[in-house]
UniProtKB/Swiss-Prot annotation:
Predominant localisation class: cytoplasm
HAMAP family named in the record: Shikimate_kinase
GO cellular component labels: cytosol
Upper taxonomic lineage: Bacteria, Bacillati, Bacillota, Clostridia, Eubacteriales
Keywords: Amino-acid biosynthesis, Aromatic amino acid biosynthesis, ATP-binding, Cytoplasm, Kinase, Magnesium, Metal-binding, Nucleotide-binding, Transferase
Name listed for the protein in its UniProt record: Shikimate kinase
Catalytic activity line of the entry: shikimate + ATP = 3-phosphoshikimate + ADP + H(+)
PROSITE patterns recorded: SHIKIMATE_KINASE
Gene Ontology MF term list: ATP binding; magnesium ion binding; shikimate kinase activity
Transmembrane annotation, as ranges: none
Function according to Swiss-Prot or TrEMBL: Catalyzes the specific phosphorylation of the 3-hydroxyl group of shikimic acid using ATP as a cosubstrate.
Organism of provenance: Pelotomaculum thermopropionicum (strain DSM 13744 / JCM 10971 / SI)
Enzyme Commission number(s): 2.7.1.71
Length: 172
C-alpha cells in the first residue's frame, strides 16, 4: 500500500496528525526531521546554524530517496521538503500527498514557544511566518488533498484524511 505523506508549513500539525493517523491505520510513523536528527546527531536548528540550510536540504533529499522505496508508512515531512521538485517526484511515486494548512495566526500560536524553528528565529515571528507563507505560495498544491488543521481538532483532521483515503481507494 502507498505511503501517506503529510506536507505543509511548519506548525500545521504534521507530526501530531501523522502520529495519530499512523496509530489509527496501524502503520509505521516516520517524522523526517526526527530521522535527520537521528542520522546526523544534531538537531534541525543545529544543522541550520552550523552547516546551513543547503546541508539540511541535502539530508532531506537523501532521506527521501531511502523512504521512496518503502511502503505502508505515514510520513511527516519538514515544511520545506517539497521545495525540491525531485523530493516531490519521489514521494509521489509511492505515496499520496496530503497538505496540512492553517492560517498565520494559528501557526504563530502553535510555534511561538518552540526554539527548534530556525527559519523563524530572527525578527518578528508573525511577519516571518507571513513572509515565508507568501514565498511558498502554491508549493503545497502538489498534494492530492488539503486539510485546514486550524479549523478542526486533531481527531477531526485524522478523520478527514481517513475519509479522503477511503473515498479514493488508498485504504480500505
Amino acid at each position: 500500500m502507498k505511503n501517506i505523506v503529510l506536507i505543509g508549513f511548519m506548525g500545521t500539525g504534521k507530526t501530531a496528525v501523522g502520529r495519530r493517523l499512523a496509530g489509527r491505520l496501524k502503520r509505521e510513523f516516520i517524522d523526517t526531521d526526527a530521522e535527520i536528527e537521528k542520522v546526523t546527531g544534531k538537531t534541525v536548528a543545529q544543522i541550520f546554524a552550523r552547516d546551513g540550510q543547503i546541508r539540511f536540504r541535502s539530508e532531506e533529499a537523501l532521506l527521501v530517496r531511502k523512504l521512496a522505496g518503502k511502503e505502508n508508512l505515514v510520513i511527516s515531512t519538514g515544511g520545506g521538503m517539497v521545495l525540491n521538485p525531485e523530493n516531490v517526484r519521489l514521494l509521489k511515486e509511492n505515496g499520496v500527498l496530503i497538505a496540512l494548512t492553517a492560517d498565520p495566526e494559528v501557526i504563530c500560536r502553535r510555534v511561538k514557544n518552540k526554539k527548534n524553528r530556525p527559519l523563524l528565529m530572527r525578527g518578528d515571528l508573525r511577519e516571518n511566518i507571513k513572509a515565508l507563507l507568501k514565498e511558498r505560495e502554491g508549493v503545497y498544491d502538489v498534494a492530492e488533498h488539503k486539510v485546514d488543521t486550524g479549523s478542526m481538532s486533531l481527531d477531526q483532521a485524522v478523520e478527514n484524511i481517513i475519509h479522503f483515503l477511503k473515498e479514493h481507494n488508498y485504504i480500505e
